[in-house]
UniProtKB/Swiss-Prot annotation:
<comment type="similarity">
    <text>Belongs to the TAF4 family.</text>
</comment>
<dbReference type="InterPro" id="IPR022003">
    <property type="entry name" value="RST"/>
</dbReference>
<feature type="compositionally biased region" description="Polar residues">
    <location>
        <begin position="124"/>
        <end position="144"/>
    </location>
</feature>
<feature type="region of interest" description="Disordered">
    <location>
        <begin position="354"/>
        <end position="528"/>
    </location>
</feature>
<dbReference type="GO" id="GO:0006352">
    <property type="term" value="P:DNA-templated transcription initiation"/>
</dbReference>
<feature type="compositionally biased region" description="Basic and acidic residues">
    <location>
        <begin position="762"/>
        <end position="771"/>
    </location>
</feature>
<feature type="region of interest" description="Disordered">
    <location>
        <begin position="124"/>
        <end position="166"/>
    </location>
</feature>
<protein>
    <recommendedName>
        <fullName>Transcription initiation factor TFIID subunit 4b</fullName>
    </recommendedName>
</protein>
<dbReference type="InterPro" id="IPR009072">
    <property type="entry name" value="Histone-fold"/>
</dbReference>
<dbReference type="GO" id="GO:0046982">
    <property type="term" value="F:protein heterodimerization activity"/>
</dbReference>
<feature type="domain" description="RST">
    <location>
        <begin position="184"/>
        <end position="255"/>
    </location>
</feature>
<feature type="region of interest" description="Disordered">
    <location>
        <begin position="662"/>
        <end position="712"/>
    </location>
</feature>
<feature type="compositionally biased region" description="Basic and acidic residues">
    <location>
        <begin position="742"/>
        <end position="752"/>
    </location>
</feature>
<feature type="compositionally biased region" description="Polar residues">
    <location>
        <begin position="451"/>
        <end position="491"/>
    </location>
</feature>
<keyword id="KW-0805">Transcription regulation</keyword>
<dbReference type="Pfam" id="PF12174">
    <property type="entry name" value="RST"/>
</dbReference>
<feature type="compositionally biased region" description="Polar residues">
    <location>
        <begin position="154"/>
        <end position="166"/>
    </location>
</feature>
Length: 852
């Protein structure tokens, strides 16, 4: 890495920490020392002519409290450091300035020499400090008698003003001002890491900014050396961006160093601004560059939370002006609790004639300059009530008066002005209720580091200076003169339009030395803006063709119609509510009885309606449960549970068997009757009887075969019909019985004929054949009832099985079709079943009455 960049990034850091108890103890001791030193040393400085004694008193007092100043600075630096770490990397610049304050003890001992040499820093830019603050005590072996005499006079004026400031400040409050000293670098070319870090953060994305912030935290904890931090930062940021940021900071610090030389305050306050945030401090500082007075009234005006009050030195917004420069330094914001503090400065103590010195004639080459010394105050106005004039006024308290004009450095058209400074009485009262969120600490910090109003090369006359105070001014921004250079006229009043550093609000112009504006001005402006916005809105509606009156009428008419509809619906609901399930008179009588028993005197009208609705809801629930349980109840007396008989197979079989038996008995009786006459005729023809027997046998066999075939065919047809779903089984059995009767009658006829022609043996054979036929007949007709050892039994079983199955199916279908729909009824059994399942009714007397 380039060694020049490395040198630019070097800085000295003080990481020393102190506990809170040590700081408080030191604070108390410091307060006692300050009170004693101020009472003993300051009253002696009363004679402006006694330069030697005042010089000794000043140096003695400065040396006595020098160490205390350093400790106070360290204390506030530590407080600022803690708050900076919470706020983030954007406030690192101020944090580093506060830390380096303890490293410059030698700047606070040789104060008169520094004040004397502050005017020479304009001619030597290499000795200009890099940050606005205390002048650097550079070693300068050369000097002249005029400078010394000027130094003595400025010292006497300085001590005189200190005495006056201390007397008035004690009436207000012991101020806290730990030496308004900004940290400076030992080498003007060096750039601190803390000042460089916010500039780089704004140009990086989130990831790289986070990496850089983490790297800086490690550097603060001494985890990595400065060389390693520089190397890693170059890797993250890049060489080109780093060079640009460093050059920009150098330019900014150079400009601020040229115009920001100021004398430190010599008062050390006995209380911190944290303990009493309602203080108004008066610090009057000499301007040593031109010999004129630059007085500042620090205003602590903007209320912040206590944790935000450690970020700045206790003196807030003093503006120190030397060689025509304007510089502001922010401090913690406090709130004066409604009290108006008015430090009145006498005019005789504030009027001094500036010593004009031809700086170009001393041989120190430099640009021609026109110095204008001003006493200004930043102006921060808070919103207040209409009749409340309690607002902080500042900024317009400088009155410029030129008593002479001398050319500087033999440059025509340029001159120096003699300033006459008069500080007007300023009302500094704040309302705590009106001090909410006006500015942020970032705004105040930016204002302290970026508010530059003019440069030595381009100076305007006092009458043409019009700086603007905003929080967005860059550090390198300067105010160029708007008119030609020239000498200012005596008694000319410079107009300064300071603006409030709050975002989005502007302040009206004010003339220096004028009285504060009326408090109702802002409200008037706000009212005018509101009226203007309403008028603009009306204009927009008119241009767009919207008639507001018609729209309003439509809206109101729609509301009326809605009201009518809602009224009708309310009326209907009311009528429905009036139709209660319980009658009013019986209900009122019952309620009266209950009230008499319970000892009630009065009952509301809504009770009747509520009871009626409750009864209705209870009955609805009971009925739904009763209907559900009635479907599950099974009663024998119900008609829907009765069975309808469509066909009785057993009865039909018994009837058929009975008929067969009767027929068989008749045949037997007829056969016996015929047997008796045949026995008498047996002896007549033996050969004929044998032939007849054989013929009868052959005919009987043939007849039986035919009958069997017929029966098989009919049974098969009946079974097929039953399988398909044909006629009733009763008809089928009837057909089969008729067929059997026919076959039996035919067989009987044939047998009778044979018996009449045949002998006694033929009659026995016919009897056997009749028995055999009757047996087969009964087996075919009865089936399951009679078991016959025959090959046709299994076929009959199969056929009858089909018949039985078909009969069952037909019977079921007929039963379902003939079954009527039963009308459901609710009986006491259903009510009892429902109440038994309810816990609150299962053991009530109503259950016993229902069961009985």
């Amino acid at each position: 890495m380039d060694p020049s960049i490395f040198k630019l990034l070097e800085e000295d850091e003080d990481e020393s920490m102190h506990s809170g108890a040590d700081v408080d103890a030191f604070q108390a001791a410091l307060n006692r020392d300050i009170e004693g030193s101020m009472t003993t040393s300051i009253p002696h400085v009363t004679n402006p002519g006694n330069n030697h004694s005042s010089r000794q008193q000043f140096s003695t007092w400065k040396n006595g409290i020098g160490d205390s100043n350093i400790n106070v600075q360290t204390q506030h630096s530590l407080e600022s450091t803690q708050m900076k770490e919470q706020e983030g990397s954007t406030l690192e610049n101020q944090h580093q300035h506060d830390l380096k304050r303890a490293n410059e003890p030698h700047l606070q001992h040789n104060q008169p020499q520094d004040l004397h040499r502050a005017g020479q820093l304009w001619e030597n830019p290499s000795q200009v400090p890099q940050s606005t603050g205390l002048p650097i005590s550079e070693k300068n072996p050369t000097g002249n008698e005029s400078d010394r005499s000027h130094n003595q006079e400025s010292e006497s004026q300085y001590m005189k003003l200190q005495k006056m400031s201390s007397q008035q400040a004690r009436g207000v409050e012991p101020p806290v001002n730990p030496m308004n000293v900004n940290p400076i670098n030992r080498n003007p070319k060096q750039v601190p890491f803390a000042a460089l870090l916010p500039t780089l953060m704004n140009q990086l994305d989130k990831d790289r900014a986070l990496q850089l912030r983490t790297l800086y935290a490690r550097l603060k904890k001494n985890e990595i050396p400065k060389e390693g931090f520089t190397r890693h930062m170059k890797d993250i940021v890049g060489d080109q961006m780093l060079r640009m940021a460093v050059s920009k900071l150098q330019q900014v610090n150079y400009n601020q160093g040229k115009i920001g030389i100021q004398a430190p305050s010599t008062e050390i306050n006995n209380q911190k601004s944290q303990s009493d945030p309602r203080a108004v401090h008066l610090n009057q500082l000499p301007s040593s560059a031109s010999g004129t007075l630059g007085s500042s009234v620090p205003v602590q005006g903007l209320t912040k939370h206590p944790q935000h009050q450690m970020q700045h030195p206790p003196s807030s917004f003093p503006m120190y002006t030397t060689s025509g420069s304007f510089h502001s330094f922010p401090g913690p914001n406090t709130n004066a609790s409604g009290s108006t503090l008015r430090p009145h400065l006498h005019d005789s103590h504030m009027r001094h004639v500036a010593h004009n010195q031809p700086m170009g004639s001393t041989g120190l080459g430099g640009p021609p300059q026109s110095t204008t010394n001003m006493m200004t105050m930043p102006k921060f106005e808070r919103p207040s009530s209409v009749n409340d004039p309690s607002r902080v006024q500042g900024g317009a308290t400088s009155h410029f008066q030129n008593s002479s004009s001398l050319p500087l450095n033999s440059a025509p058209g340029q001159g120096s002005s003699v300033s006459h400074v008069k500080q007007e009485s300023v009302d500094q009262s704040f309302e705590k209720n009106n001090a909410a969120s006006m500015t942020s600490n970032e705004d105040l910090e930016k204002e302290s580091s970026r508010m530059v109003l003019s440069t030595p090369n381009n100076m305007a006359p006092a009458s043409s200076v019009s700086p603007s105070m905003t929080t967005q001014l860059d550090a390198s921004t300067t105010m160029n003169s708007r008119g030609p250079l020239g000498t200012s006229q005596g008694g000319a009043n410079a107009r300064m339009p300071p603006k409030k550093p709050s975002v989005g609000q502007k302040k009206p112009l004010e003339t220096l030395g004028s009285s504060p504006p009326p408090p109702s001005k802002k409200q008037k402006v706000a009212g005018n803006s509101m009226d203007q916005s309403i008028e603009q809105l009306n204009d927009v509606t008119a241009v767009s063709g919207v008639n507001l009156r018609e729209e309003e009428e439509q809206l109101f008419s729609g509301a009326k119609e809605d009201g009518r509809v809602s009224e009708a619906s309310r009326r209907v609901v009311h009528e429905e509510e009036e139709r209660l399930i319980l009658q009013k008179n019986p209900l009122q009588r019952k309620l009266a009885e209950i009230m008499a028993k319970a000892g009630l005197k009065q009952i509301s009208n809504d009770v009747e309606r509520c009871l009626s609705l409750c009864v209705e809801e209870r009955m609805r629930g009971l009925l739904s449960h009763i209907i559900r349980l009635s479907k599950q109840r099974v009663d024998a007396e119900k008609s829907r549970h009765r069975t309808f008989i469509t066909s009785d197979i057993r009865l039909q079989i018994n009837e058929m068997n009975q008929k067969v038996k009767e027929e068989w008995e008749k045949k037997q009786a007829e056969a016996e009757k015929l047997k008796k006459p045949s026995e008498s005729e047996e002896g007549d023809g033996g050969v004929d009887s044998e032939k007849d027997k054989e013929d009868n046998r052959s005919k009987g066999v043939k007849g039986n075969k035919e009958d069997d075939d017929k029966m098989r065919t009919t049974a098969a047809n009946v079974a097929a019909r039953a399988a398909v779903g044909g006629d009733d089984a009763f008809l089928k059995w009837q057909l089969m019985a008729e067929a059997r009767q026919k076959s039996v009658s035919e067989a009987g006829k044939d047998g009778n004929q044979k018996t009449t022609s045949g002998g006694g043996k033929n009659s026995k054979d016919r009897q056997d054949g009749g028995r055999r036929f009757s047996g087969t007949e009964s087996s075919c007709g009865v089936g399951i009832v009679y078991r016959v050892s025959s090959s046709r039994f299994w076929f009959a079983m199969m056929s009858f099985g089909f018949l039985f199955a078909g009969g069952r199916r037909v019977g079921k279908n007929q039963g379902s079709s003939l079954q009527p729909k039963v009308v459901r009824t609710i009986s006491v059994k259903d009510v009892v079943a429902v109440l038994e399942r309810e816990p609150q009714m299962s053991k009530s007397t109503l259950m016993y009455r229902l069961i009985q």
